[in-house]
């Protein structure tokens, strides 16, 4: 469905992720736009099909854009995704995370440490890398989902998705994926593209399975992180609905 509609997705993301994220989204069939200026972020959010917000390289001007864009998306009934990168690492990040959380994201996607920190518990986050297991974040994910009325995806070696009542685990993926910067950030863009006009829970599960399956495909050919990136873009481009139906490893308890 996503390829047929090629949704326009606005991404207020970090400097590290922009290029990788745009290429990942284009390979998948979405239409990414990296629009973050305060003067236009809210106006653009009103016309985009979905919005993603990533707090990786924060600054006050960007924070203002994130809030106005999220409010505009809410006002227009457009879904938006929060990627709370290293949200527990500094006081500033915790403050910004709390402000964005209060705007009730449609989907929150983060690693276990980020989800635990966002829910308000001490987490063993080392910046952007997860020190906590996905299973440890399960309770925090449920609490966050019930607080926002949205979906929470805890991503790691296996992914957990919940909307507070429904649960799914996605087991697709490849060990090289964490070795390449911005692949997690780029996944947030794919989630944004998948949820445009769809049930957020099922669309998020599908997005994670698709992304992980592309990683598995890439891993079959790659000799290391460099060749993996190239093979991953190709896999995102070539995977179709039938491949996803056959290859998705989704557990619903």
Predicted regions and their residues:
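Short pre-catalytic strand/loop immediately N-terminal to key active-site residues, enriched for Gly-Thr
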Residues: 138, 142, 170-181
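Glycine/small-residue-rich loop that forms an oxyanion/phosphate-binding "nest" at active or ligand-binding sites
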Residues: 54, 62-111
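Charged C-terminal helix
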Residues: 213-253
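Short, well-structured alpha-helical segments that form the helix of a local strand-helix-strand
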Residues: 140-145, 200-215, 233
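Glycine-centered short loops/turns at secondary-structure junctions
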Residues: 29, 76-77, 149
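N-terminal glycine-rich anion-binding loops that anchor highly charged ligand groups
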Residues: 10-23, 35-47
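Conserved phosphate/ATP/ADP-binding segment of small-molecule kinases
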Residues: 92-167
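Short, small-residue alpha-helix embedded
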Residues: 117, 179-209
């Amino acid at each position: 469905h996503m390829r047929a509609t090629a949704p326009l997705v606005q991404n207020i993301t970090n400097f590290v992720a922009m290029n990788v994220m745009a290429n990942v989204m284009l390979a998948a069939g979405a239409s990414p736009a990296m629009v973050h200026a305060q003067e236009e972020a809210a106006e653009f959010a009103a016309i985009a099909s979905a919005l993603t917000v990533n707090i990786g390289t924060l600054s006050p001007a960007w924070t203002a854009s994130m809030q106005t864009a999220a409010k505009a998306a809410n006002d227009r009934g457009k879904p938006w995704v929060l990627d709370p990168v290293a949200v527990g690492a500094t006081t500033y990040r915790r403050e910004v995370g709390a402000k964005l959380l209060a705007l009730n994201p449609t989907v929150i996607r983060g690693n276990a440490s980020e989800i635990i920190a966002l829910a308000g518990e001490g987490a063993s986050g080392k910046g952007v890398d997860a020190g906590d297991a996905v299973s440890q974040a399960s309770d925090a994910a449920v609490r966050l989902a019930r607080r926002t009325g949205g979906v929470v995806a805890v991503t790691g070696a296996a992914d957990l998705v919940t909307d507070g009542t429904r649960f799914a685990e996605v087991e697709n993926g490849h060990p090289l994926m964490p070795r390449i910067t911005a692949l997690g950030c780029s996944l947030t863009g794919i989630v944004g593209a998948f949820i445009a006009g769809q049930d957020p829970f099922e669309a998020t599960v599908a997005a994670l399975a698709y992304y992980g399956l592309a990683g598995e495909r890439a891993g079959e050919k790659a000799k290391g992180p460099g060749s993996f990136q190239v093979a991953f873009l190709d896999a995102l481009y070539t995977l179709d609905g039938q491949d996803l139906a056959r290859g998705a490893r989704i557990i619903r308890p």
